[in-house]
């Protein structure tokens, strides 16, 4: 290896987020410092994958050196550890882009989530993916020498930083293609200047890497003793894990491979490894993470699988093999049926891609169903992290709507908790005799749902109601119309009918009361005019004087709020005003002869109903005026 400095040396400042990340890593990840080696070897493996891919269309990039690998050497006297690869390498612009900045959207949001709690911070940093910067966990300075494939020897670059505010970059001459990372070790990082410690870490983290990882070590004599001669000895198996038989792979190997492909620190919740032969020949290895990425709900969040074709790496983040509502899935797919020169554009409309997407989707749904059935506690862990994303499924994937619906979890009146633990199948099992609908309520929050006046008749009749209070719920219910042969019924809709649960005597009494109150309803309708769609009596309330509901085919309150929050114009919702003739306030309103006072009562009851339904009203001053006037008269 021969490198010489030449010219064009400059000092540049780090992007501010890089400085913050370096500081946090040194303090938050210290207890797990050996991961720096996993990250750097993983990056070297990626560099080899990228060279293989580019060499498919330009074999000259190999420059006579097609045996790709990673090499580790150390110098205890100089206090340095060097990780070298002969992969794709980097140009000067690449180095500035990748080593001086964090090229990720939403980084400011990520850093805003960090705290002073080191254990929590380390988990967040792990989700962010530290990559190259992990070198500073054990090194007080790092030197990178790199030459991109296809560039001349004198177009190499040297980058150097002590991990503080800036770095230097200069042109050098480098004979070998690829990248050398030289770590100038801290005092507390010297444990890695030891061959057996390096062997231990490589065996733990990098056995599954598909290229050789070698150490520069002494040649053994016939008696197994070290000689003065040295050579490169391969340490890892260098066989891509997914190509091996499942029966030969240990649980720990699957877990470490997940960390390699995802750059996550935590073990996955579960995984599925499958080799399929038939119409399409492919291997898939799919993981369900334990923790959601910090930017999961960001529109620019990168998702998708690693794509290989005939064991050759093609691309990262191939989102064409997973629907958007499964963007939390990590792993890879290795196809024998796609062309090696496949592009993202070709993938988009490719029949093989569509077939593999369908198969992978079903595989993930099966994984989740198995988890929900066999380990409910683990499934609820998954739900807390990814439930909001999975809820997008019924709107996006009609073919698997029933399966997805079975995986959804909600709260309900059956449990006194905001935890979403109730599945639709368990709700159906508990349905009251004669009940043929799944009753649900959407609201802004659990508290608003739990205390909704719409629940009063259901509580009285002992009928369970599913409580939905995530913003996406109302949108999802536009697509989720039934489950297990049972129709969904919103309890805030005018078409709600529970008469089958009432006796004939009760029905007769309600009919008489409705007739008696006909004039009050007409008087109220006359006062309100076009402000409401209709006024009518209701017998579904116990302690509440009035509510508002919408027609079955009219947009609901929560959907209108969702559109408004997204900056879209929502059509005006025309409510039906329902009054409870058995409530003392309604009776007092009915007995009021003075039209102005009657109007104040109507404003009071309508205002209450609108507040309970929407959490707001168009004219609060009119409502407050009605309250003040009525209180003054008492």
UniProtKB/Swiss-Prot annotation:
<keyword id="KW-0143">Chaperone</keyword>
<dbReference type="InterPro" id="IPR037196">
    <property type="entry name" value="HSP90_C"/>
</dbReference>
<dbReference type="GO" id="GO:0051082">
    <property type="term" value="F:unfolded protein binding"/>
</dbReference>
<dbReference type="GO" id="GO:0016887">
    <property type="term" value="F:ATP hydrolysis activity"/>
</dbReference>
<keyword id="KW-0346">Stress response</keyword>
<dbReference type="InterPro" id="IPR020568">
    <property type="entry name" value="Ribosomal_Su5_D2-typ_SF"/>
</dbReference>
<protein>
    <recommendedName>
        <fullName>Chaperone protein HtpG</fullName>
    </recommendedName>
</protein>
<keyword id="KW-0963">Cytoplasm</keyword>
<comment type="function">
    <text>Molecular chaperone. Has ATPase activity.</text>
</comment>
<dbReference type="InterPro" id="IPR019805">
    <property type="entry name" value="Heat_shock_protein_90_CS"/>
</dbReference>
<keyword id="KW-0067">ATP-binding</keyword>
<dbReference type="Pfam" id="PF13589">
    <property type="entry name" value="HATPase_c_3"/>
</dbReference>
<comment type="similarity">
    <text>Belongs to the heat shock protein 90 family.</text>
</comment>
<dbReference type="GO" id="GO:0005737">
    <property type="term" value="C:cytoplasm"/>
</dbReference>
<dbReference type="GO" id="GO:0005524">
    <property type="term" value="F:ATP binding"/>
</dbReference>
<comment type="subunit">
    <text>Homodimer.</text>
</comment>
<dbReference type="GO" id="GO:0140662">
    <property type="term" value="F:ATP-dependent protein folding chaperone"/>
</dbReference>
<dbReference type="InterPro" id="IPR036890">
    <property type="entry name" value="HATPase_C_sf"/>
</dbReference>
<feature type="region of interest" description="B">
    <location>
        <begin position="345"/>
        <end position="561"/>
    </location>
</feature>
<feature type="region of interest" description="C">
    <location>
        <begin position="562"/>
        <end position="634"/>
    </location>
</feature>
<feature type="region of interest" description="A; substrate-binding">
    <location>
        <begin position="1"/>
        <end position="344"/>
    </location>
</feature>
<dbReference type="InterPro" id="IPR001404">
    <property type="entry name" value="Hsp90_fam"/>
</dbReference>
<dbReference type="Pfam" id="PF00183">
    <property type="entry name" value="HSP90"/>
</dbReference>
<keyword id="KW-0547">Nucleotide-binding</keyword>
<dbReference type="InterPro" id="IPR020575">
    <property type="entry name" value="Hsp90_N"/>
</dbReference>
